[in-house]
Amino acid sequence: DALAPFRVATPTHDTPILSYLQETGDKNFDIQLEVAIQPQGQAETVICHSNTKYLYWSAAQQLAHHTVNGCNSRIGDVYASGTISGKEKNTFGSMLELTWRGTQPLKMTDGTERKFLQDNDTVIMRGYAEKDGVRIGFGEVVGQVLPAL
């Protein structure tokens, strides 16, 4: 219910889809996403601003596809949507896309560059929906890349 005002249409599908995946109406959500990298002991650099409205498949379609072959899904299960990328470079959802396979490094706030994540980098993901002065925040997901043993 809380996200109802943030519903948006899914992108148009390039090819016909199976009947169990067909749906009508606004099934995606307009949720702003932000990803930052924070090198150890340094300030963070925001590297991506994306949005769940770019998801090619809605959450309902993803769940239907996941379970259609008999794979159970229960309360508390977690599944990943995959990379959420827009069409502009700053909306690309992976380091591989953002750096064009490591050929175009990202400039960090501290002046260093990143082609890929490095040991001790912290990745921070944030999400929120905002419309007409109403903001629903989802907080942060934070993880640090630890060196191999």
Question: Which residues make up each language-model segment?
Answer:
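Catalytic-core "active-site belt" of small-molecule-metabolizing enzymes
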Residues: 1-74, 84-149
